[in-house]
Swiss-Prot record:
GO terms for biological process: L-proline biosynthetic process. It is found in: Cytoplasm. Residues 280-358 form the PUA domain. Pathway: Amino-acid biosynthesis; L-proline biosynthesis; L-glutamate 5-semialdehyde from L-glutamate: step 1/2. It catalyses: L-glutamate + ATP = L-glutamyl 5-phosphate + ADP. Catalyzes the transfer of a phosphate group to glutamate to form L-glutamate 5-phosphate. Its EC number is 2.7.2.11. One of its GO terms (cellular component) is cytosol. Keywords: Amino-acid biosynthesis, ATP-binding, Cytoplasm, Kinase, Nucleotide-binding, Proline biosynthesis, Transferase. This is Glutamate 5-kinase. It comes from the Bacteria. Belongs to the glutamate 5-kinase family. ATP binds at residues 15, 173-174, 215-221.
Length: 373
């Protein structure tokens, strides 16, 4: 099964964690060199590769005398400002022997939440790939604030699969996949070779927190796999410090854990709405509206809304909740909060009478709406 699925892959997003390329003495140039040679081998076989590389903060924090994780965002930003150039230099030097050039792309969540900037970033990415350049993506930690953080590069790598229109996500970790218990403390822990569907039990099994040098534990990796597989992209979590790990994976060796893509996956736009675009508000709806949206695939009309929370404009994402406040959908609002306060509970035929204009009958059109599974 794995070999058959991998035979259809053309474009790969490879996420490299801090725990893989960072050792006791700083950046592990031997590992970076080994991974670069692996990627060059894939490129020579006709694959396209997008690299998501952590390590900027871990590389730069030593210059500031920081032990462990930087405790504040300003310290993290300062460490990233020092470390990002060194990280890129390491990748540049590692790819040079095989005649490959690298290009840096730094992103914040806002870059992907804004559809125009998302498409601009995609155009840049596609141009780099067209010219045989290896894009190296990282979060723009020097300018990011809490509200627009990706949180970790596992999450960023999952969103990059949509940005890059990739066929496969490989997350290189310091653990060789998902186990039924922590393999670092339980030698008898059993590894899962294939996960067909990421259930709540699987998510709970991942558990755990990040390491001293990184922010992403197994829980964030499984969450990233869930986001990628919902877009139809298979995901492999594997030990990135194994020699020749990438060519071995693409040859079909049963390394790590393979999370299978969801057969009925989201469109690119709905994946963007669901995961890239941050919610600015909340709409509480009655049971009739909930059934229409969640069970019948209808648009959300103003008549079913009875309460509004948050501050949002037309075009912002909002969460849609039932009467008890449980989120069951997310979508893009066709009207601002101020406008909705005037038309909620009314029939669509009254919108133009109340506002003096009308963008449409729907508060959230079904084409701009994602129901939570």
């Amino acid at each position: 099964m794995r070999k058959d699925l991998l035979s259809q892959v053309k474009r790969i997003v490879i996420k490299v964690g801090s725990g893989v390329i960072f050792g006791q003495d700083g950046l592990d140039l031997d590992v970076i060199g080994s991974l670069s040679r692996d990627i060059c081998a894939l490129l020579s076989q006709g694959y396209e590769v997008v690299l998501v590389s952590s390590g900027a903060v871990a590389t730069g924090k030593g210059e500031l005398g920081i032990v462990g994780r930087p405790p504040t965002i300003p310290l993290k930003q300062a460490a990233a400002a020092i470390g990002q150039s060194r990280l890129m230099r390491a990748w540049k030097d590692a790819f040079r022997p095989c005649g490959r050039c690298v290009g840096q792309i730094l992103l914040t969540r806002d870059d992907l939440a804004n559809r125009r900037r998302f498409l601009n970033a995609r155009n840049t990415l596609m141009t780099l790939l067209e010219y045989g350049v290896v894009p190296v993506i990282n979060e723009n930690d020097t300018v990011v604030v809490e509200e627009i953080r990706f949180g970790d590069n596992d999450n960023l790598s999952a969103l990059t699969t949509s940005l890059a229109e990739a066929d496969l996500l490989i997350i290189l970790s310091d653990v060789n996949g998902l186990y039924d218990s922590n393999p670092k403390t339980n030698p008898a822990a059993r590894k899962f070779s294939v996960i067909e569907r990421i259930t709540e039990d699987i998510e709970q099994m991942a558990g755990g927190a990040g390491s001293v040098v990184g922010t992403g534990g197994m829980a964030t990796k499984v969450e990233a796999a869930k986001r990628a597989t919902l877009y139809g992209v298979g995901t492999i979590i594997v030990d990135g410090r194994q020699a020749g790990v990438l060519p071995k994976l693409m040859a079909g060796e049963e390394l790590g854990t393979f999370f299978l893509p969801v057969p009925q996956h989201m469109t690119a736009r709905k994946h963007w709405i669901s995961f890239s675009k941050a919610s600015r508000g909340k709409l509480l709806v009655d049971e009739g509206a909930r059934r229409a949206v969640a069970e019948k695939g209808k648009s959300l009309l103003p008549s079913g809304i009875f309460s509004i929370e948050g501050k949002f404009d037309r075009g912002d994402a909002v969460r849609i909740c039932d009467a008890e406040g449980r989120v069951f959908a997310k979508g893009i609002a066709s009207y601002s909060r101020q406008e909705l306060e005037r038309i909620m509970g009314r029939n669509s035929s009254e919108i133009e009478v109340v506002l003096g204009y009308k963008y449409g009958d729907e508060v959230v059109h079904r084409d701009n709406l994602v129901v939570k599974k």
